[in-house]
Amino acid sequence: MRRGGLLASLIFLLAGALEPAQAGQTHVAVAANFAEPAKEIAALFKERTGDEALLSFGASGAFFTQITHDAPFQVFLSADEERPKAAVAQGFAAPGSVFTYAVGRLVLWSRVLDVSKGEETLKAGAFSRLSIANPAAAPYGAAAVETMKALGVYDALQPKIVRGNSIGQAFQFVDTRNAELGFVALSQVRGVPGGSQWLVPQALYTPIRQDAALLKKGADDPASKAFLEFLRGPEAKAIIERFGYGLE
């Protein structure tokens, strides 16, 4: 009996040792402009590692506020470089974990107007609604304001500006024709059929360096660390470039 019991115990332990390791999960806060590439990267990450990245999309400013109020995110993919650095400075992210994963490009886009000569379109002002993301919460919104000020049209266009909570909502306003045109991320209109766009010259706004950070809740989590490492790798970079982002 004792030998049989010992053998059964050994078989049980061996079976447990041979079971595949349970896949990990990481909760990732993703700036809305990066939604589509993030989905592709997460799918490939799961295929390569077995780990799952659970993605939430929104405005970087809103995410930062949630992170400082104990939200369960483990990784932060911001649309700017300031908030990830602030997260480290305030003790909400791991020191040394911040890096630039993409450099965003701003476009003026419309479903109904020819905006290919964007500066002329903005100066003429022959439209009733111009969509931008909330500049206080979304870096692409701040870049839109900076662009309009550089062109000397901001004051004249202010009454026509409608603000989305995020760049995702700003895109939706234009896509659904609730605004005739709007400033959105190049990544959002890559591959979108129809419409007209003007790629805003980089000289008109501060480069949109989008930084990632390993948050305090993910500092000891293997899946969170693995996701950020994958984000820095060649397969993820190829996806990022395909959506129109620059790399550093």
Question: Model-flagged regions — what are they?
Answer:
Residues 24-57, 61-71, 77-81, 85-91, ...:
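Exported/periplasmic ABC-transporter solute-binding proteins
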Residues 19-23:
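Sec/Tat signal peptide C-region and signal peptidase I cleavage site
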Residues 1-2:
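N-terminal secretory signal peptides that target proteins for export/translocation
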Residues 5-17:
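Bacterial N-terminal signal peptides
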